[in-house]
Amino acid sequence: MSDYTNTVTVEITSDDSLVADVIVVPVASGAVPRLPEDSKFRAYEDILQKLGVTGSKDELTRIPLDGSKHVVLAFIGVGKAFSATELMFAAGSAVRQIGARCIQIDFSVTQKDKLSAIVEGAFLGAYRFDKYRSKKSECPEVIRVSHNINGITDSECRQIIARAKVIAGSVGLAKDLVNTTGDDLYPAQFASFVAKDLEGIDHISVESWDEKRLQEKSCGGILGVGRGSNFPPRLVKISYTPGQYKKHLSLVGKGITFDTGGLSLKPASAMLGMKYDMTGAANVFAVLRIVALLRLSVRVTGWLCLAENMLSGSAIRPGDILRTYSGKTVEVTNTDAEGRLVLADGLALAGDERPDVIIDIATLTGAAKVALGESCSGLMGNNPDLLCSLEVAAKSVGEKFLAVPIDDDALQKALKSDIADIVNVPTSNKVPGMQFGAVFLKEFETTNDSGEAIPWAHLDVAGPANASYDTGFNSCGPTGVAVRSLVEFCRCLSSAPERKLF
């Protein structure tokens, strides 16, 4: 695995000359297709209308450029408005769909935030995963992004490109991890990759706990889930500690490198995509990488809870009792609810450091996908202000988080076990699965030195973690969901640490 952004060159230019193979122009939807007011290609609006172009997202229409035998105009739909997020998705969609060697994105932008969004979208759209293909996918080699911004300096343009490259490259590495098959990526190999990739980055350190260390620390959740596999579990701690900071954020990621369901075996159709069950850990790694490379002034600690959930003579059985790191015992009523068991250890370990806020991310429940679909992540926690701040951060980068309440007495009662502290799955089928998963994890929240619960949020990304169709800058497969949202949240903590976010 390597940073794919090193294989594509993105340039920012104010040069009006059309020197690319394909010129990409945005078109918005409405009663008639609309181009930006100052676009040099507005004369094509009538042609687009006659062709039935709607301007809907991902719609791509190719027309030969007047007076040129070799240059093609590609009109990409942006939806209803030329907003920064819509332009980002449109740029990414065009780059994803067009295989020409040189592309010029001419969106007639006059604002720096829109230019930044377009460059980021272009980088994200250039991602390809060809590890297991005999023939490589076509991908642009040069992407020129033109603009109409007065007074922007070359230095500012370089900064925009550098930032977008860091974000897209890190998201790409997370996607590579998720795309890699279970037989090529077991817990120890995952841990080794993270340590090697982050080596040499300023202010960042990586610590990997093997099964012996996990045993010494009494991490019964991670050990229990991993004991049925020939490949033992790992816990990876990534620490980013800049020279100056005022806030400390802990991120905990579920990292089940393959999930058979254990003895509560999944059906074959449900097992096929279970290499994706380590999305949370992969995306936490990406957030730490971005935050460190962008040198944000916020301390961030990542906890990657890595295990393979297999079935064997040594696998945990329904009815077994696991003692987690916190000392709390769990009756395993279903071995296919293993993600919450590894997160239980990760959350308690994160709490030991008394950070200002803890956020976990996991493909935790199928119920989240049923309830919210593929475009929205479930957001739950113990602090309404934190949930609101995360929703705002997500919206600003074009993602969707929906806060879901979990303060329900019935959910609390469903945790009850006859022989242990709690169960991992309720015996009643009337309990909402997504919310119960969060209520289970809430049992492992920690108090700060003042005796108050540390603000905690749980992101269930089971729906948007994996796209079932191509859209925007994402091809079918892993999406890197929540990475950019959490980076934006970190940026807020870094730039305005006194601002009330939780």
From Swiss-Prot:
HAMAP family, per database record: Cytosol_peptidase_M17 (MF_00181)
Active site residues of this protein: 266, 340
Catalytic activity: Release of an N-terminal amino acid, Xaa-|-Yaa-, in which Xaa is preferably Leu, but may be other amino acids including Pro although not Arg or Lys, and Yaa may be Pro. Amino acid amides and methyl esters are also readily hydrolyzed, but rates on arylamides are exceedingly low; Release of an N-terminal amino acid, preferentially leucine, but not glutamic or aspartic acids
Job of this protein: Presumably involved in the processing and regular turnover of intracellular proteins. Catalyzes the removal of unsubstituted N-terminal amino acids from various peptides.
Name of the protein described by the UniProt record: Probable cytosol aminopeptidase
EC numbers, comma separated: 3.4.11.1, 3.4.11.10
CDD domains: Peptidase_M17 (cd00433)
